[in-house]
Amino acid sequence: MKLLKPTWVNHNGKPIFSVDIHPDGTKFATGGQGQDSGKVVIWNMAPVLKEEDEKNENIPKMLCQMDNHLACVNCVRWSNNGVYLASGGDDKLIMVWKRAAYIGPSTVFGSSSKLTNVEQWRCVSILRSHSGDVMDVAWSPHDAWLASCSVDNTVVIWNAVKFPEILATLKGHSGLVKGLTWDPVGKYIASQADDRSLKVWRTMDWQLETSITKPFDECGGTTHVLRLSWSPDGHYLVSAHAMNNSGPTAQIIERDGWKTNMDFVGHRKAVTVVKFNPKIFKKKQKNGSSTKSSCPYCCCAVGSKDRSLSVWLTCLKRPLVVIHELFDKSIMDISWTLNGLGILVCSMDGSVAFLDFSQDELGDPLSEEEKSNIHQSTYGKSLAIMTEAQLSTTIIENPEMLKYQQRQQQQQAEQKNASIREASGAATTAPKVASMVNGESLEDIRKNLLKKQVETRTADGRRRITPLCIAQLDTGDFSTAFFNSIPISGTLAGSIMSSQNNQQLMSLDSNAANSLNTSKPSAEPTAASIKPTDDAASKDGVNATSVSTAPPASSSSVLTTPSKIEPMKAFDSRFTERSKATSGTAVVTNTNQTVVDRLKDQNLIKDNKPKDILESSSDSEEKIPAAKPLSAPKRKLELEGETVEKKKKGRPRKDSRLVPVTLTVQSPAALASEKDAACISAPALALKLPTPIPQKSFTLQVSSDPSMYLEVENEMTTVGGSKLSRLKCNREGKEWETVLTSRILTAAGSCEIVCVACEKRMLSVFSACGRRLLPPIILNTPISTLHCTGSYIMTLTTAATLSVWDVHKQTVIVRDESLQTILSGSDTTVSQILLTQHGIPVMSMSDGKAYCFNPSLSTWNLVSDKQDSLAQCADFRSSLPSQEAMLCSGPLAVIQGRTSNSGRQAARLFSMPHLVQQETTLAYLENQIAAALMLQSSHEYRHWLLIYARYLVNEGFEYRLRELCKDLLGPVHYSRGSQWESTVMGLRKRELLKELLPVIGQNLFQRLFTEYQEQLDIL
């Protein structure tokens, strides 16, 4: 045995709490305390193994240093394939690192000495769930799961294939959880905590298998960590700090019956870390000895607070070697090399030690094939030797579930083969990939960057060059470092992690190109421009009328209604979602130009440029301040004005100037004083909205059909003493026109109908081809706002009453419903009006609330509240897999577009108990389903229903899941008195159930899957 303490491996005198050797043996990582943050350092293994490499100045010792953790790093662990490095620290975070293929070294940021990062490692995922310090992390044998434990008494199982998805949160410990280890077979995971217990959990259903407490009854919480370990053959689990007759031991727990009859004794203080050698050994055969095969055995290293290290062989009753006073402080972590002959040990004193054994001392290691045969003969097929495509966390009990998984695997294989073919085709055209980036050589890129630097001359003739930051170039791949003197086994390749995107709406000016910001939790945001489609809306799309306020004193105040839709923010933080926008820039002529000129001076009007823009249903960021009222306080109803333009003959310009027009609304009388209000309630006055001022002529662009224009010309001619007004419609080059006997105040249209509101409270309705559908409708009060969607007409009168009709069916949907109910506060305004394609009116208020009117119940229902704590605290990201991230642009998405990221932000900023987060998430998802049902948005209903079901499965809410399945299945046998409806908004419930069943069968609810699958087969 050789012992080495490389002094160059240090954290500048600060403690080192963790060490781990890379699976290929070329490097190792340390984690601990930095100067003012946590520190993760990746070191070269070659100078540790060979003295000549240590003396060679051309071989770097430090490869990379990462100071991203805000507090001390307690654990670092490499994934079994060597692609990822996970680190957990006191900042409650787990960071997952991956090597980046940047060209050239870089200096360590903030370093006083000129430290150089030879390799570049970037954080690809930040895992947030723990509410306390993260003490330990561990990768599963097949790298599909990552487990973390914390002082918050929980163990979190992360889906390593789809970070940051949480598969399970293991609760049961009543003390700080300080250690984790996976069963090498993949059936169990064990955790040890300060509550004097060691718990073993099943990976099949993430439930508790057993809790062992007797060996720990005399233990106290005196150790910083409790790093337990499982033997590579799976037979034994060895704990950290245990007691036997008041003496510190490492308890040996047998897998068969979880018996605790043996332990490792001899240390004078508490055992902090136990680490099994990854190899299984057999006795080395000497020359001339019997060829009889020996019984395999394992090797284990034990570290203690007494600063000593002991190495044990399970075939011996006494330790193979004991090294006393190896460090000045407690041993914190141990890591074996993959060949099983080397061991790295770190201490709280900030140093590490390396022990190099020979095969004569430990024995002959078994090959991986022999090791796998032991696993298969003892336990069946081991998860450690299964590929990800073969990975199955549960035993498949149903052949239908097996067929479904096989179909999924086949589809994934086909997609993979297609991508490989595309990549190979591209590779043939670019043989020099390593030296080319985006079609340019790296040398050309560097030269072009240097040309951009700014050089000036001072008065005395000296040159002054402004520094230019040149970002490092990522070639997309990296080769083996030249200084690695150890052969690397295999190619360490991994797919780039999908970035989690948060979408944020930018400026909403009609002439500015809109963009969505996409950001990763651990990266700076990047912009991605989105082009609108020509489609008016998707299946359940809406036409939106944004509302602004101003006094109607000027004759130039013309009510207009351009329709814009704000894209919904991403449901799942991982993907950029693009929303279909309805283009609807209305154009209206204005006979008085003074208002426009005044607005120009205030920089409130900008020219529309011929660019692709993403329009929004929300208000513009720049608004005209309402004129100060001369009487009682006013309640303002913000209405989206339709844009104004000078009348010109022929087809109007598309690059019209948008003019927001403000309208005042008479508010109820001022409230009585608090003294009088105690006994007298002042009667509320009726709301009063302004009437559109008649204009000589104006032009509108129909929001749902950008190729459709309405031209109005009032009092164009006089016939028989009466003045006639003309309505002209132009759609894709086809025109029709008609005349009316009254002046037209406002107009609206859709793909099916055209509607105009005239003086004398008359409403006229025409077909899309100009045929009058109804005699003039006489309204109770004058019109204030008019809107059309499909065959539906919505009117808002000056008395603040709302009405909706279906022209084709000639039925009333909403009859003179007052807005008094939802305009609760004196400062509340209506910021947006929506009319869905199902005739559901929606009012978005300035206080962040949105209401829709339910014709069946004749009630206003709250469908969205931007201040709702449920929306801010719900966290359902783990329930949405990456391949199912979908675009949702229905009415609910439009209403909630501004706040879709609030829950994600709150989850990062504020910690809460997991049980409370479960309850808030369930309540939020159920509210979303109910709101989508109220808005008759079928695709949004299906979207949220799938998310809800997946969340129930992930969290194990069987009773709610069963209730959901029962409602979708309905009665198995026909009953004449049954009230069950087989469809919901045109969606067949049993078809929805078929979509949910594969999600249910992926977890511990296979029997529930079988139960409902059989009933569906019968039906």
From Swiss-Prot:
Transmembrane segments: none
WD repeat extents: 11-53, 68-107, 129-168, 172-211, 220-263, 266-322, 326-367
Chain segments carrying region Disordered: 406-433, 513-561, 599-633
A GO biological-process term: DNA-templated transcription
Chief place where the protein resides: nucleus
Region span, Interaction with RBBP4: 23-443
Chain residue ranges for the region called Interaction with HDAC1: 444-1019
Source domain of life: Eukaryota
One Pfam family this sequence matches: Beta-prop_CAF1B_HIR1
Compartment list: Nucleus
SUPFAM superfamilies to which the protein is assigned, alphabetical: WD40 repeat-like
GO cellular component: chromatin; HIR complex; nucleus
Amino acid composition bias (Low complexity), ranges on this chain: 406-415, 544-561
Spans annotated as Interaction with HDAC2: 960-1019
Keyword annotations: Chromatin regulator, Nucleus, Repeat, Repressor, Transcription, Transcription regulation, WD repeat
Biased composition range(s): Basic and acidic residues: 599-625
Effect of L996A: Abrogates interaction with HDAC2
Function per UniProt: Cooperates with ASF1A to promote replication-independent chromatin assembly. May regulate the transcription of a variety of genes controlling cell growth.
SUBUNIT field: Interacts with ASF1, HDAC1, HDAC2 and RBBP4.
Sequence similarity: Belongs to the WD repeat HIR1 family.
PANTHER family in the record: MEMBER OF THE HIR1 FAMILY OF WD-REPEAT PROTEINS, PROTEIN HIRA
Protein name as catalogued: Protein HIRA
Organism of this sequence: Gallus gallus
Name of the encoding gene: HIRA
